[in-house]
Amino acid sequence: MIKIQPEEISSVIRKQIEQYNQEVKVVNTGTVLQVGDGIARIYGLAKAMAGELLEFEDGTVGIALNLESNNVGAVLMGDGFSIQEGSRVKATGKIAQIPIGESYIGRVVDALARPIDGKGDIPSSETRLIESPAPGIISRRSVYEPLQTGLVSVDAMIPIGRGQRELIIGDRQTGKTAVAIDTILNQKGQNVICVYVAIGQKASSVAQVVSTLEENGAMAYTIIVAENANAPATLQYLAPYTGATLAEFFMYSGRHTLVIYDDLSKQAQAYREMSLLLRRPPGREAYPGDVFYLHSRLLERAAKLSNALGEGSMTALPIIETQAGDVAAYIPTNVISITDGQIFLSADLFNSGIRPAINVGISVSRVGSAAQIKAMKQVAGKLKLELAQFAELEAFAQFASDLDKATQNQLARGRRLRELLKQAQSSPLPVAQQVLTIYAGVNGYLDSIAIEDVKKFLAGLRNYVITSKAAIINNINSSKAVTPETEGMMKEAINEYKKVFAAGA
């Protein structure tokens, strides 16, 4: 029989007492009362914060949105099929944040910045809150630099500046995404980081956008955030904030960024779904009362930063889909009032072959000519006036039988100017070529060209100037203005090419 040594036992006990750790880890936990439709009701969690991340037993993460007297309503960032009534929930003490960094450029990620393009993990050492506060008044300066879209009708008449919020609004299938993608393509070589956020889109549509950007070499400066139509409402609601957060990283490091939200109507619908399931009181069109705040806090994050903060910028192009052209519906009017102007795309113009189908009459930029180079200001003012007069005359001419010669000439020029604004998809024009094109139109050089030949003539003219008269393009690019010398060279080049075109025709 083994003899027990009391000294040994006492030394073991003493050692264990010395090593005993008195620290107590307090964890805020709760119990699932009810789960379904992407919503969980939790008993307990008395100290939960609004917007705090919650961790369920199966690893699913949720966000505490409703803090009620006897339970917490949380939205799930996953399907939550393996969460059961009575399972434990742990409050993490954290607010939703995502990793950020340079390595995200060229990648496709989801609303939690996790890669979904099959190209492996994204290395990152920094994180940023998804819901970051917008820059204050002192942190900003007024918009003064142009952000060229490459579309003649936008850059000439509805100019967008770096740091502006310009809404793209129109019915389905009117080319809203095409305008946004062309703007991304036109940022090549401009040192602008683009973020395209796809909310509730078909996976095939997102794949098409990715392939268009890859074919044109635009993925080298673009990040895509995608939450498809089959994603939980919570992730569709978060996706735009994730896009803004990724762009903010570059903005605060003194870079220029462009963010496209395609589209915010679907984000509002996802938020409505979440709110109704959380039993929040419905308002107009069954949207919750804070749906305006949903969009305003997102779009206010777009800014042109002050010199002290490095003069970075975030330009936002939110997209809104209307039903049968109704811009007076709830969400469209909300976003129109938040943004600095809107580009209105018309189904009638689209169907009549005018593409991009931009209705110049009701589209507006509230930044205006501050976001244009001098050369564009010199030629674009006349273009807008001529088109406005043409629209008025065209409506009148439908009822008048005999028109005088001056009116006929004005109508003929208006039709040619309308032709000048047509552009093929994925073929944005550099600003110097736009100036040349508009100059030819407003100064009557197209009046003798048949309407059906205008596009062919302008394409040939641009090609002729690039190959034979490159000094014109170089002068406009360097001086950002049409000097008398450049104007003389433009007149000469247009007249020379007209002879070449007439001989070829």
From Swiss-Prot:
Membrane-topology descriptor: Peripheral membrane protein
Localization (cell): Plastid, Chloroplast thylakoid membrane
Molecular functions per Gene Ontology: ADP binding; ATP binding; proton-transporting ATP synthase activity, rotational mechanism
Domain of life: Eukaryota
Keyword list, A-Z: ATP synthesis, ATP-binding, CF(1), Chloroplast, Hydrogen ion transport, Ion transport, Membrane, Nucleotide-binding, Plastid, Thylakoid, Translocase, Transport
CDD domains the UniProt entry points to: ATP-synt_F1_alpha_C (cd18113), ATP-synt_F1_alpha_N (cd18116), F1-ATPase_alpha_CD (cd01132)
InterPro entries: ATP_synth_asu-like_sf, ATP_synth_asu_C, ATP_synth_asu_C_sf, ATP_synth_F1_a_nt-bd_dom, ATP_synth_F1_asu, ATPase_a/bsu_AS, ATPase_F1/V1/A1_a/bsu_N, ATPase_F1/V1/A1_a/bsu_N_sf
Site (Required for activity): 363
GO cellular component terms, semicolon-separated: chloroplast thylakoid membrane; proton-transporting ATP synthase complex
Reaction equation(s) it catalyzes: ATP + H2O + 4 H(+)(in) = ADP + phosphate + 5 H(+)(out)
Pfam family, one: ATP-synt_ab_C
Enzyme Commission code(s) on record: 7.1.2.2
Binding of ATP, residues: 170-177
Root EC class: translocase
Function: Produces ATP from ADP in the presence of a proton gradient across the membrane. The alpha chain is a regulatory subunit.
Family note: Belongs to the ATPase alpha/beta chains family.
Subunit details: F-type ATPases have 2 components, CF(1) - the catalytic core - and CF(0) - the membrane proton channel. CF(1) has five subunits: alpha(3), beta(3), gamma(1), delta(1), epsilon(1). CF(0) has four main subunits: a, b, b' and c.
Name of the protein described by the UniProt record: ATP synthase subunit alpha, chloroplastic
Record gene name: atpA
